[in-house]
């Protein structure tokens, strides 16, 4: 045989074409303009390789990547370089758990349901909220779903976002809002904090969304923001870094109606930006409007504790037209990674890890100030902040890479007026030597 297997015979092809009413493959592709079809061949791919040669070739390609195992990283902005305890992968790769899906006969998989229930419980404890779902795709889609919930619950059409919320979250919310015709307004930052006074001029406000700490690393006064939002008749939504909540007051205790965020800091690798795991928490009053799946605890007919998927009438696979959301999946595997990491750390460990992040970032900030750099907002922050550079931050990033350092995010990516500013992050993984190396490299920047 010329091939290991025959994926499709001519008879198979003919039968399938007849079934769909096409005479040929060309008929099947008729709606695709010839101008956009690839007319070339795959000769540039080369001849098939033995597995050993293929692995060698791919390894050489992979070696061209610059990764955080080789170079110290000062890049954050939503995806962070944290240590994942070894127990995370040890447990995650067990056959009992190694699936991204909740099962279609869920009550059979009591172990998986218990793991999700424990994840929900820990997230509620961190955020100070009453109920959490089993997870969402990522923090930003959780934020957009929270905005949709607020508009449906309040029967209002204006979503208000602080400029301290991740710029890409603004884009996702606007995409979500476009279909149902919702309005999206923004509140600027003044001296690093959300200008809540500007809320007075807005009408029909369904919610106000802030980030905690905000995109630029600043820790804002949530209570004042919550009070102003509620006075306007809207829901107060907080996008919170869950690791920071090891030190900061829980949003639920400061007036948040919904707290969402991304669990990536807990045991989930950076992986070029995903996949991660979004968490979604809210109050009992909004429990029946929360998107996604909920695992609840109950007892069986013998009085033994058990776990079930509960309140499923909210979900689109039960009643599509009246569902609270069209999301019908979750990130159960990554949620499990987060819950294993949180369990391994414990309450004291999470606090100590958060403290280490805080101390490392402040040590870097102090060193940069001593070296003559300007910190754009020197207010309270967690593990990232903005530094003003003498040259374009994108060019600075290239020079840092040449020095063996992954630099921070050039803010000119989102705002041309901030082209010389870099959002710098320092996690618990950065050593004093690496901090000194970074400061020295910034001091040696030259104009291109």
UniProtKB/Swiss-Prot annotation:
UniProt cross-references to SUPFAM superfamilies, sorted A to Z: PLP-dependent transferases
Give GO BP annotations, semicolon-separated: glycine decarboxylation via glycine cleavage system; nucleoside metabolic process
> In the UniProt record, what gene is named as encoding this protein?
gcvPA
Task: Tell me the superkingdom of the source.
Answer: Bacteria
Instruction: Please give the catalytic activity noted in the UniProt record.
Output: N(6)-[(R)-lipoyl]-L-lysyl-[glycine-cleavage complex H protein] + glycine + H(+) = N(6)-[(R)-S(8)-aminomethyldihydrolipoyl]-L-lysyl-[glycine-cleavage complex H protein] + CO2
Which NCBIfam families does the record cross-reference, listed alphabetically?
PRK00451.1
Q: Which UniProt keywords apply?
A: Oxidoreductase
Stated name of the protein: Probable glycine dehydrogenase (decarboxylating) subunit 1
EC category name: oxidoreductase
CDD domains from the xrefs? GDC-P
EC number per UniProt? 1.4.4.2
Q: Can you tell me which family this protein belongs to?
A: Belongs to the GcvP family. N-terminal subunit subfamily.
Q: Which Pfam family, just one, is annotated for this protein?
A: GDC-P
Q: What does this protein do?
A: The glycine cleavage system catalyzes the degradation of glycine. The P protein binds the alpha-amino group of glycine through its pyridoxal phosphate cofactor; CO(2) is released and the remaining methylamine moiety is then transferred to the lipoamide cofactor of the H protein.
Annotated HAMAP family = GcvPA
The UniProt subunit note reads as follows: The glycine cleavage system is composed of four proteins: P, T, L and H. In this organism, the P 'protein' is a heterodimer of two subunits.
Q: Drop me one GO molecular function for this one.
A: glycine dehydrogenase (decarboxylating) activity
């Amino acid at each position: 045989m010329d091939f290991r297997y025959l994926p499709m015979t001519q008879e198979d092809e003919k039968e399938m074409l007849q079934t769909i009413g096409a005479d040929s493959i060309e008929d099947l592709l008729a709606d695709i303009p010839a101008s956009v079809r690839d007319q070339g061949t795959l000769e540039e791919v080369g001849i098939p390789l033995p597995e050993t040669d293929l692995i060698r070739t791919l390894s050489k390609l992979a070696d061209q990547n610059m990764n955080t195992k080789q170079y110290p990283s000062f890049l954050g902005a939503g995806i962070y370089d944290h240590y994942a305890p070894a127990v995370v992968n040890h447990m995650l790769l067990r056959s009992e758990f190694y699936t991204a899906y909740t099962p279609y006969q869920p009550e059979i998989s009591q172990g998986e349901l218990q793991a999700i229930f424990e994840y929900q419980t820990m997230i509620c404890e961190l955020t100070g909220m009453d109920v959490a779902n089993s997870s969402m795709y990522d923090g930003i889609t959780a934020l957009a779903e929270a905005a949709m919930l607020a508009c449906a619950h309040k029967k209002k059409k204006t979503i208000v976002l602080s400029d301290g919320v991740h710029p890409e979250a603004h884009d996702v919310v606007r995409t979500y809002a476009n279909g149902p015709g919702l309005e999206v307004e923004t509140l600027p930052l003044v001296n690093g904090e959300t200008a809540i006074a500007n809320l007075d001029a807005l009408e029909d406000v369904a919610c106000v969304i802030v980030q905690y700490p905000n995109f630029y690393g600043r820790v804002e006064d949530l209570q004042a923001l919550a009070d102003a939002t509620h006075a306007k008749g809207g829901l107060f939504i907080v996008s919170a870094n869950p690791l920071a909540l090891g030190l900061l007051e829980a949003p639920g205790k400061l007036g948040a109606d919904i707290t969402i965020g991304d669990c990536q800091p807990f045991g989930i690798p950076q992986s070029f930006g995903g996949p991660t795991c979004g968490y979604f928490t809210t109050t009992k009053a909004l429990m029946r409007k929360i998107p996604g799946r909920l695992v609840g605890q109950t007892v069986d007919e013998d009085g033994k504790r058990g776990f079930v998927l509960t309140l499923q009438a909210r979900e689109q696979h039960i009643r599509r037209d009246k569902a609270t959301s069209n999301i019908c999946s979750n990130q159960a595997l990554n949620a499990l990674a987060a819950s294993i990491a949180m369990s391994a750390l414990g309450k004291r460990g999470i606090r100590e890890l958060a403290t280490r992040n805080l101390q490392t970032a402040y040590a870097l900030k102090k060193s940069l100030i001593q070296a003559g750099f300007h910190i754009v907002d020197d207010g309270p922050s967690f593990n990232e902040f903005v530094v003003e550079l003498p040259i374009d931050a994108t060019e600075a990033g290239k020079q840092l890479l040449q020095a063996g350092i992954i630099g921070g995010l050039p803010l000119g990516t989102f705002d041309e007026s901030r082209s010389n500013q870099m959002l710098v992050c320092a996690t618990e993984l950065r050593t004093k030597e690496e901090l000194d190396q970074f400061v020295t490299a910034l001091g040696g920047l030259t104009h291109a």
